[in-house]
Swiss-Prot record:
A motif (Nuclear localization signal) lies at residues 221-224. Residues 178-223 are annotated as: Disordered. It holds the Pfam family Response_reg. The modification 4-aspartylphosphate is found at residue 68. PANTHER family: RESPONSE REGULATOR 23-RELATED, TWO-COMPONENT RESPONSE REGULATOR. The keyword Transcription regulation applies. SMART domains: REC. This is Putative two-component response regulator ARR21. Binds the target DNA as a monomer. One of its GO terms (molecular function) is DNA-binding transcription factor activity.
Length: 613
């Protein structure tokens, strides 16, 4: 029996057109009434061949086909295959009281399986299959006017009846879906999907039907930004320009001006950079980043002011014989050095570094001699000799730089000891331009300039001659009153027996206005107790006056020549060959004098004043 049933509700509400095919007339009538009660439009057919004929006529008015599995002449699966060949992919549901046919039905392309008897809850499953087919554009809306059918195109917005609004939405099941993913509820006969059915759902490609019937186009995946070294350097420049505390992705992006960068890229990189800095701070590696660093692309991104070590000595500027000289010393006059070394040709560049960076040692204790003296007396604690280890890690200068107003000193690197004029050294030109810049000494001429070498030259009694070129009518009187008495100076034991002198030379005075026309009477005396001899020689050479004082020990002789030049620009000559061409004056023997008389100040003053005049 084939008859067209009218709608239960005659209003023009969206209807689902369902064709029911079953050879059992009783079940076909019950099924049709249930669907009509749920606002379906039902076409009931009792033969598979009639169903094919009806489809040829009302193909566009049928949204879903429900067929029984067991039918004479053609079973439900054969009907499904024939419909697919002739009319395309129409949704077909298979009904059967034999639940073993579920797997076979699904594997052959059926959209679903409904076990008999039908339960009202199964009607919702029927609706979801039909609605999915309608949204694919294959269904029509039928409105009954005067009991006649009219085809109307389905609008995009579908209005659902209240009974169909709460229907769940599922996908089309694959043909290879297994029966163990579904269980049959024996109480109500309904087929309930397990958790595995939802997990096995696959997302359909773009443009195809989805869960809610709408094509869901996935957004294109953003291209990953590769932070190269140049791009990272630009990022660091932006950080330095803006400041780490005020750096935000918007400002950094504006500073970098890279077209393909986004705020998300910069924000992600900035977050990684701050995490890197936090990790560095926790490990306490800020001081080691310049050498070792952390294995990261942020290895050069710790932001701080550049550190300049102005105080690291560079031994490449010096000869190896200068190892014991302080690199932080200032240019100073030697101990006992007179003002005869003053010149106006080249200035003394004192150390321009602040004292708070110099790491001055507590053992550096200068002792001033006199109120107007430019000399500084060293103490034993801050004298460094080869055989005596220094108390400090860094060797310091022996003397504090003299405070001189408009005075210019040109001295050698040797800090002389017990000098009244130039330092007594050998093999080194005294006109050695020496300046101190930024805490280090830069000699312009190589040579032995060690303090110990100067003292060794003093003890070895090497002959040195001082030959200036003074202009006429010039007088220079060294301030000898400010010289300390050497008997109070106790040096290290390596100096030998030179810590005490048998006479006081503080009253030496030179009068250069009086020139001697002939050779002065030479005087010679010898002190056996002190094991040294002193030779005084007054020598006339034009407008020059020389005083030779020779002090000797058993191991050698040392000659200090003191002159009173009449010029402001003295020239120091330490050429031994020059002394050979000069006449050697004769000396008188002073050995008959009493050593106690030599110690007497009045006797020595009268003796030297008479010789000078």
């Amino acid at each position: 029996m084939a008859s067209a049933q009218s709608f239960y509700n005659q209003s023009s509400v969206l209807k689902i057109n369902v064709m029911v095919v079953d050879d059992d007339h009783v079940f076909l009538d019950i099924m049709s009434r249930m669907l009509q009660h749920s606002k379906y439009r039902v076409i009931a057919v009792d033969d598979p061949k009639k169903a094919l004929s009806t489809l040829k006529i009302q193909r566009d008015n049928i949204d879903l086909i429900i067929t029984d599995y067991y039918m004479p002449g053609m079973n439900g699966l054969q009907l499904k295959k024939q419909i697919t060949q002739e009319f395309g992919n129409l949704p077909v549901l298979v009904m059967s009281s034999d639940t073993n046919k579920e797997e076979e039905s699904l594997s052959c392309g059926a959209m679903g399986f409904i076990p008999k008897p039908i339960h009202p809850t199964d009607l919702t499953k029927i609706y979801q299959f039909a609605l999915s087919n309608k949204r694919n554009g294959k269904s029509t809306l039928s409105t009954e006017q005067n009991h006649k059918d009219a085809d109307v195109s389905v609008p995009q917005q579908i209005t659902l009846v209240p009974e169909q609004a709460d229907v769940l939405k599922t996908k089309r099941k694959n043909c290879s879906f297994k029966s163990d993913s579904r269980t049959v509820n024996s109480t109500n006969g309904s087929c309930v999907s397990t958790d595995g059915s939802r997990k096995n759902r696959k997302r359909k490609p773009n443009g195809g039907p989805s869960d809610d019937g709408e094509s869901m186009s996935q957004p294109a995946k953003k291209k990953k930004i590769q932070w190269t070294d140049s791009l990272h350097d630009l990022f660091l420049q932006a950080i330095r320009h803006i400041g780490l505390d005020k750096a935000v992705p918007k400002k950094i992006l504006a500073f970098m001006s890279v077209p393909y960068l986004t705020r998300e890229n910069v924000a992600s990189h900035l977050q990684k950079y701050r995490i890197f800095l936090r990790r560095v701070a926790e490990q306490g590696l800020y001081s080691m980043l310049s050498d070792r660093g952390i294995d990261s692309m942020f290895r050069q991104t710790h932001i701080k002011e550049p550190y300049f070590n102005y105080y690291t000595p560079s031994t490449s500027w010096y000869d190896t014989r200068l190892n014991n000289r302080s690199f932080y010393s200032k240019p100073v006059h030697g101990f006992g050095q007179s003002k005869l070394l003053s010149t106006t040709r080249e200035p003394v560049c004192f150390n321009q570094m602040p004292y708070n960076y110099m790491n001055r040692s507590s053992t550096y204790e200068p002792h001033r001699i006199g109120s107007g003296s430019n000399l500084t007396l060293p103490i034993q604690s801050n004298l460094s000799f080869p055989n005596q280890p220094s108390q400090n890690e860094e060797r310091r200068s022996f003397f504090e730089p003299p405070v001189m107003a408009n005075k210019i000193a040109q001295t050698s690197q040797v800090l002389g000891f017990g000098q009244l004029g130039p330092s007594a050294i050998s093999g080194h030109n005294f006109n050695n331009n020496m300046t101190s810049r930024y805490g280090s000494l830069i000699p312009s001429q190589p040579g032995p300039s060690h303090f110990s070498y100067g003292m060794q030259s003093f003890l070895n009694n090497e002959n040195v001659t001082y030959n200036p070129q003074p202009p006429a009518n010039a007088t220079t009187q060294p301030n000898l009153d400010e010289l300390p008495q050497l008997e109070n100076l106790n040096l290290y034991n390596d100096f030998g027996n030179t810590s005490e002198l048998p006479y006081n030379i503080s009253n030496f005075q030179f009068d250069d206005n009086k020139h001697q026309q002939g050779e002065a009477d030479p005087t010679k005396f010898e002190l056996p107790a002190a094991k040294f001899s002193t030779e005084l020689n007054h020598e006339d050479d034009g407008d020059w006056t020389f005083v030779n004082i020779n002090q000797g020990q058993s191991n050698g002789e040392t000659s200090n020549t003191i002159a009173s030049p009449e010029t402001n620009t003295p020239i120091l000559n330490i050429n031994h060959n020059q002394n050979q061409g000069q006449d050697v004056p004769e000396f008188n023997d002073w050995s008959f004098l009493d050593p106690q008389e030599l110690v007497d100040d009045d006797f020595m003053n009268s003796l030297f004043n008479n010789d000078m005049n």
